[in-house]
């Protein structure tokens, strides 16, 4: 028996030493690569100080309306990933892409990502970069919480919301992260902080961005570099862990019924008849019913719909804005 325990102890210590050695090696390699890639990160936008932290806002175009593009969770380089869409809007309008804390060229804030903090940072970044309200918000995924909360707290600042396959505030409340999911989020952050994500690039950035041609070859390399640097950092981790509390804050306020809302529902062919797609459509319909002016349009494609249907999104958005003006 003593011999067995001795063998098990040796095996355990050996495995622990191997894991430590691999982790240290990956960490060193990751930071070596970060130092090499730093030369690529020359900036894209206007960097402003928000509560002692640097935040980046990219803007282009001119016109009466300002469309604010708000990325989903983990979209580490939104000014690059969403270029294929916002470049269509900027031909006749002003656009702004806000890098939330921990995204793009913005610094990691290391706060708990409470929705009030997130919203005030976004508002200050826009104002300090010369983008004054009212805005037409273009949220994607988890940014749906911030967009709706913004319209609830500052309705005069929001001209309309064009929601790209967003997560509704009440969905983050109804489908609260389980204890196991929260452990997965924390574990994933730990692995990425060491640098293991380097070995699964398809999980770090969207290969579709590289496949398409709206970025130059140089921009594609910058896009990759930002993703490797920022992917699933502390702010992105806390953003997910805080989603239930943030959704609850919005749910507990009256719906901003005067705000015109266009919901773009991304539905892929293979998931069209799935329980998720059917329930999501019902959720969207119930949500839209709370507004004086609201419409839902179904688009063929997966969640990152701005990559697959940019022309259709632009067309539907312009039609909707002409209708509500």
UniProtKB/Swiss-Prot annotation:
Domain of life of the source: Bacteria
Compartments in which it is found: Cell membrane
Disulfides per UniProt: none
Protein name: Uncharacterized protein YbdG
One Gene Ontology term, aspect cellular component: plasma membrane
UniProt topology in membrane: Single-pass membrane protein
Keywords from the named record: Cell membrane, Membrane, Transmembrane, Transmembrane helix
Main subcellular localisation: membrane
Span of domain AB hydrolase-1: 94-166
Transmembrane intervals: 10-30
Transmembrane helix found in the keyword field: yes
UniProt xrefs under InterPro entries: AB_hydrolase_1, AB_hydrolase_fold
Pfam annotation, one family: Abhydrolase_1
């Amino acid at each position: 028996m003593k011999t067995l325990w001795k063998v098990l102890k040796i095996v355990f210590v050996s495995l622990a030493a191997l894991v430590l050695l691999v982790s240290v090696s990956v960490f060193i390699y990751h930071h070596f690569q970060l130092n090499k890639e730093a030369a690529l990160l020359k900036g894209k936008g206007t960097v402003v100080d928000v509560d002692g932290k640097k935040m980046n806002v990219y803007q282009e175009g001119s016109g009466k309306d300002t469309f604010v593009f708000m990325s989903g969770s983990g979209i580490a380089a939104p000014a690059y990933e969403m270029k294929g869409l916002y470049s269509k809007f900027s031909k006749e309008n002003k656009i702004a892409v806000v890098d939330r804390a921990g995204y793009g060229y913005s610094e990691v804030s290391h706060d708990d990502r409470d929705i009030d903090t997130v919203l005030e940072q976004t508002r200050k970044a826009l104002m300090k970069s010369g983008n004054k309200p009212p805005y037409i918000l273009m949220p994607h995924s988890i940014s749906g919480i911030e967009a709706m909360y913004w319209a609830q707290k500052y309705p005069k600042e929001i001209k309309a919301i064009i929601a790209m396959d967003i997560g509704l505030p009440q969905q983050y409340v109804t489908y609260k992260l389980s204890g196991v999911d929260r452990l997965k989020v924390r574990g994933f952050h730990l692995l990425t902080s060491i640098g293991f994500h380097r070995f699964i690039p398809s999980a770090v950035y969207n290969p579709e961005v590289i496949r398409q041609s709206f970025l130059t070859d140089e921009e594609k390399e910058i896009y990759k570099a930002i993703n490797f640097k920022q992917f699933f950092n502390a702010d992105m981790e806390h953003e997910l862990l805080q989603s239930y509390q943030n959704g609850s804050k919005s749910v507990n306020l009256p719906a901003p019924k005067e705000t015109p809302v266009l919901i773009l529902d991304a539905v892929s062919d293979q998931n069209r008849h799935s329980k998720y797609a059917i329930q999501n459509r019902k959720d969207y319909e119930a949500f839209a019913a709370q507004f004086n002016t609201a419409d839902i349009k179904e688009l063929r494609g997966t969640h990152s719909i701005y990559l697959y249907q940019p022309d259709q999104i632009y067309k539907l958005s312009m039609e909707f804005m002409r209708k509500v003006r």
